[in-house]
Amino acid sequence: MSCSKAYGERYVASVQGSAPSPRKKSTRGFYFAKLYYEAKEYDLAKKYICTYINVREMDPRAHRFLGLLYELEENTEKAVECYRRSVELNPTQKDLVLKIAELLCKNDVTDGRAEYWVERAAKLFPGSPAIYKLKEQLLDCEGEDGWNKLFDLIQSELYVRPDDVHVNIRLVELYRSTKRLKDAVARCHEAERNIALRSSLEWNSCVVQTLKEYLESLQCLESDKSDWRATNTDLLLAYANLMLLTLSTRDVQESRELLESFDSALQSAKSSLGGNDELSATFLEMKGHFYMHAGSLLLKMGQHGNNVQWRALSELAALCYLIAFQVPRPKIKLIKGEAGQNLLEMMACDRLSQSGHMLLNLSRGKQDFLKVVVETFANKSGQSALYDALFSSQSPKDTSFLGSDDIGNIDVQEPELEDLARYDVGAIRAHNGSLQHLTWLGLQWNSLPALPGIRKWLKQLFHHLPQETSRLETNAPESICILDLEVFLLGVVYTSHLQLKEKCNSHHSSYQPLCLPLPVCKQLCTERQKSWWDAVCTLIHRKAVPGNSAKLRLLVQHEINTLRAQEKHGLQPALLVHWAKCLQKMGSGLNSFYDQREYIGRSVHYWKKVLPLLKIIKKKNSIPEPIDPLFKHFHSVDIQASEIVEYEEDAHVTFAILDAVNGNIEDAMTAFESIKSVVSYWNLALIFHRKAEDIANDALSPEEQEECKNYLRKTRGYLIKILDDSDSNLSVVKKLPVPLESVKEMLKSVMQELENYSEGGPLYKNGSLRNADSEIKHSTPSPTKYSLSPSKSYKYSPKTPPRWAEDQNSLLKMIRQEVKAIKEEMQELKLNSSKSASHHRWPTENYGPDSVPDGYQGSQTFHGAPLTVATTGPSVYYSQSPAYNSQYLLRPAANVTPTKGSSNTEFKSTKEGFSIPVSADGFKFGISEPGNQEKKSEKPLENDTGLQAQDISGRKKGRGVIFGQTSSTFTFADVAKSTSGEGFQFGKKDLNFKGFSGAGEKLFSSQYGKMANKANTSGDFEKDDDAYKTEDSDDIHFEPVVQMPEKVELVTGEEGEKVLYSQGVKLFRFDAEVSQWKERGLGNLKILKNEVNGKVRMLMQREQVLKVCANHWITTTMNLKPLSGSDRAWMWSASDFSDGDAKLERLAAKFKTPELAEEFKQKFEECQRLLLDIPLQTPHKLVDTGRAAKLIQRAEEMKSGLKDFKTFLTNDQTKVAEEENKGSGTGAAGASDTTIKPNAENTGPTLEWDNYDLREDALDDSVSSSSVHASPLASSPVRKNLFHFDESTTGSNFSFKSALSLSKSPAKLNQSGTSVGTDEESDVTQEEERDGQYFEPVVPLPDLVEVSSGEENEQVVFSHRAEFYRYDKDVGQWKERGIGDIKILQNYDNKHVRILMRRDQVLKLCANHRITPDMSLQNMKGTERVWVWTACDFADGERKVEHLAVRFKLQDVADSFKKIFDEAKTAQEKDSLITPHVSRSSTPRESPCGKIAVAVLEETTRERTDVIQGDDVADAASEVEVSSTSETTTKAVVSPPKFVFGSESVKRIFSSEKSKPFAFGNSSATGSLFGFSFNAPLKSNNSETSSVAQSGSESKVEPKKCELSKNSDIEQSSDSKVKNLSASFPTEESSINYTFKTPEKEPPLWYAEFTKEELVQKLSSTTKSADHLNGLLREIEATNAVLMEQIKLLKSEIRRLERNQEQEVSAANVEHLKNVLLQFIFLKPGSERERLLPVINTMLQLSLEEKGKLAAVAQGEE
């Protein structure tokens, strides 16, 4: 409030007249003094304040006010004295201490008092810039003596505020004043990385002056040339930056002088150029910047000058921009350091962007403008004119860079729009997201035919911002997205363009550019728009000043409503229409289905907002305009009533396009047909042509062909309509989303297709359809096929779900190629099976590696020799726990090196290849067959077919490479060189592998005649060998004797997740039992974001041991709280999964510094904001006609048939080879693969909790697939020695490795130590061993130690993964013992049954006790998957009565456990064996063998009768039945089993009858176990066990040697889809034929009758259940304890919520009270204050005395 002197005198007189006493008058003096102070009557004010001080001398306010009056009179001494007295009376006045220090330093720095008050103020304001300036003044007065202290002061200040321009300049000046120029230059160079300093004109001026001084000093010394060149480089960069800032902020004269100085620097550097170095690259770039700034200066001169000749200036400016644009981009590799490279790259993009846009701007509307400029000014006279226009005529031209530069070689080259778009993206980074720069770029693109790439610009600035939000109705700042910012920029550019047009219409020359260069043009956006943009950038990049973020959030929140057109947005309808059209056009040009849906969806949003406004305009009503809108209204673009119909039509077209994008094709067609316009015709043509293409791709019937022709006719009709409308009205061409040429081209193509149909063209062959799989060609959608620009089309997918929309084309292509390749391979197999005279050809060093196409993998002929192209998966050496990621079982991509001559596809999965086992006859020792040595191949091998044929025939005749001959040397090193991996392998050579080039040279000799093909040379091998030779060690090369295993790619469980945060912390867990924090461990705390579903979780593992300490989701309801007593720790509560199950935990993380703790909190809250914006969208329903599924099914059937056919051929030929080699062969094994494809409806395991997928594999033993093209894959074979010669010379050893450990977790180690997995596509390589000479290995391997587990001589009747608990009586609650496989084991001898469970990994016993008849299982209350019982347990070594509980994941598994448990009690009484859980039943399943494979097999097989020897007959008669049924209504087909020798078994399997159970070989009762024979061979002590486990979706058997054991674990799966195969393989020296028969009838596997005594004992055991009543009571008590604990937690949570609510209410009351008190203070004494008295009395609960005082204050008496 201001008043005059007269008012003050009247008021003083009235108050003094009513005052009862002089003292009362004096007490009013303070108020009188304030009145005169406002009236600027300082003398009268001093008079009254002095009278007041005489009465109230202890009032600090009066002394402060008097000091202010003295300060205004510049009486510093008296002012300081008054301020000092006020501080003495009230020491809390911190600002007054700083004021005294400033006054003393200003008056006399040498005064000793100044230093005292400065130090006192420094303690009150640490880190204040004002304190620094005061200390700097004090040290400056000391001269040279204070330089060291001043240097320390500046350094400490820089540590706190590195961006402060004044401090940085002061440091450089201090260096310069002390002649430390090198340090000054180093400081300038270091500070160049700071963006805040680079944007300061004062700093850049300081840098230029410093570098110039340093260069002068270097020239005097002439010591270091490299230092001089580096400094010159920095000087040129500083000049360019200073020139840009000067043009923006200074006048024309200063800019001209600086440009002349820049010219001198370039001329000086030009004389020192030489070679390709950093200075040369920088000089070339600075030359471009020099000419660009020269052009900008010319236009700035026209902007500020009078009577300007715009034509002359614009032509000279165009010359400068042409030169700048044609300067090539610098060679970035010449620049040292990544920062320098990035800087120069950004500067180059900025130069090319600005110069290119200005060239287009200046030449717009002028024909051959650039050509005229080049012809006129690109010569000496034009150079002189340019020099005279820029510089003063006094300076000589020859000594300047501009006057001596050669400009005669420039071309007339207009910038390409694609290049400009790319340069713009790079320039965005150079300007750090400046709204002025973005608006300027948008204005340049606004006048061009193409759309600006605003989306790409914003992606450069805001990497992690989502593109669209699902919460358009909200205005929360956390929901801001890329589309909001893009809409904002479109609005700013739109309004700025209209404003420029209005200015240009008033006074504008034809040669004056519409938009001046960026450094010269005025501000293009309003202050409101700029402040909003800056606030958004500050919040997103987390650069808000503490305490200012709330204000920024309010600012952003207010304008988001406007951008999203919510509530009273006040937007002009024309702007809304502009937004809708631009977004629809941009969305149609994007390639991603999701991007199109979001852009066109936002366009529809704005159309819906503008349609009601159009109705208002149609009624000729006015639309209110806000007073201060975010986007200014321009009446020049107001929508007229005549335009409304057109806009409504555009809106409905956009609605229909969105329907098409979302897959609602029928709705889109209906909408388009209702709109009669060329746009709707074009979209209808696209839709019908797409339908025709879909049918043509799968056309199999005449009805579909006719439908395809109808669609093509409709397409033709709509295209003809477009052409007719365009001929009659040329204006409709502008509405077309594509050029007219695209319409004509598409019409021509459609006519050609119709002509082909009518004349029996490509789709017909001899009156019938061509083979769909071999001849069909996949057509791309017409939008991309016929549109000249990708921006003219949109994508939609009417037949597939959204997630397949983008991958459908590539998926179908891959399937067609697979089908074609499979058919060719089947035909080749038919041809090759009839050949028997081909020779086996072993690869030698002259055999080229490129004769086999990609995807073909040779067989492993030696034990454990893996293929070099095999995938890298888990093995026994590197086993990774799969507990945290279900992707563990997926196989990595095959590491195949493509070479020329390979197949057409760039990538073929390993499932397309197949391997053929090589018989052991192909590799023999010491057996000479001269006939084989004399033959040679007449034709070189050209492809894999020939190689395969020779391999098969060679094995059939029993011919192979022979060692032991002496005519020529044949070493293993040669073999290693000639093959492409370890061992002998057919496949591609890995050029990076040099493993066995020198191992075992001249160990064996061999004679091989003329088998090598002279046409195939080994040039590639020689090149590879030369690459590893060195000058000093050509003759010496050492190879390891035993190769290390290949490194396996470890699976951490964090695949597919992005690390948002990682920091080393110490984690604690609150133990409620002892009410204290317990340390969990040290490690890195990570915040991971799932890229698929957007969920965020927190994960921490201990150092070294990597045990999981924390693993839980981050939710929006979680709250971080500081740990009391520490500013470096945060605590929170979460449902943690680190121990396996969800468990509510209170966790705390302690950081090293408070800064790290604060950073964690910010990142945590940022993740919660990310979670708030996850779109809750459900995928669209699958609208599929089934064509893709049929094609996939057809391909899978063919592949399955191919594998069965190959297996049959391989086994048959192997058998023939064995019969012909009577003396040397033993039983060999073929290979087959049983593959059962999962149904399309088959889904993965159902989880109990939503959050349980963190440990999905931990308790899941079923592996299934829900995708047509995804299947679980197996791990790599176990790597062994290259040559395995440690087998016995007699006998045939067969070994098996389980394909999937069904009783344990996926991908765990089985008993033999091998890593197991599943693979339903890969072929199984069967290893074979033959009799021959025995060779001692060079380095013998250690003997295999048999691990004794204590479970020998026991059968596993039940095994499944579960969680085990023990009831703790002391604390009255259940405690977890561990997670692992719980087993029920029965001893073969005494039939005792026990429960055994070990923990995962550590294998510590959790349970080990007998099952007695008096034990009973009881369900725990609240869940039926938990069983509770009481037993005498020996897990800890001693007998102890325990109350135990086990929890299963699935209900059926829990029921199975109960059933087996009950059977175990009775089995012990009867002294009988229990039927294992795995052999109970088999689920009916589909045949894995395709019909095509059956047909091929029936055509190529022939019946063969084998003679069964006597022993075999006896054994075959006693085969044990194995349950394996297949219930099908049609012809049942089962893939042939392993080791099928002869056609009888095949005939049985492929008969029309229902499949019957079958067994393998000898199955005598003695020694057989669960259908598996373990009889010892006649002449050998070694035998091998085998167990084959087959799940419902996969079945695989792999060969693996193992030791003899008395029992074998029977693997099982949760869905009980298991087969048990019984086999017995007697080994003799003579050749033995094996035949597997299918018995017609077999007795049951287990049969037992109950005797009378057993029944009595069983009845008596039921009477003993009363003994367990106490146990049940204790369990009930334990359950109650758990419930009470949960109730306690709920109560504490309720109390916490109530406290939070009370705190919120209290905070609101305090805020209200503060507002009331402020209002009370500023109101005049009287009735207005009295009105607030009741409110204040009520809220403060004042006493009567206090109320009286407050009333007096309200009246103005006190």
Swiss-Prot record:
Transmembrane segments: none annotated. Residues 176-229, 805-837 form a coiled coil. Pfam families: GRIP, Rab_bind, Ran_BP1, TPR_8. Residues 1236-1245, 1581-1594 have a biased composition (Polar residues). Residues 761-805, 1216-1248, 1307-1335, 1581-1622 are annotated as: Disordered. TPR repeats lie at residues 60-93, 584-617. Keywords: Coiled coil, Phosphoprotein, Repeat, TPR repeat. PROSITE patterns: GRIP, RANBD1, TPR, TPR_REGION. One of its GO terms (biological process) is NLS-bearing protein import into nucleus. Residues 1037-1173, 1334-1470 form the RanBD1 domain. Residues 1318-1330 have a biased composition (Acidic residues). It comes from the Eukaryota. Residues 1595-1618 have a biased composition (Basic and acidic residues). The modification Phosphoserine is found at S21. Residues 779-798 have a biased composition (Low complexity). GO terms for cellular component: cytoplasm; nuclear pore. CDD domains: RanBD2_RanBP2-like, RanBD3_RanBP2-like. InterPro entries: GCC2_Rab_bind, GRIP_dom, PH-like_dom_sf, Ran_bind_dom, RanBP1-like, TPR-like_helical_dom_sf, TPR_rpt. Residues 1703-1753 form the GRIP domain. One of the 8 copies of RANBP2 clustered close to the chromosome 2 centromere. This is RanBP2-like and GRIP domain-containing protein 3. It comes from Homo sapiens.
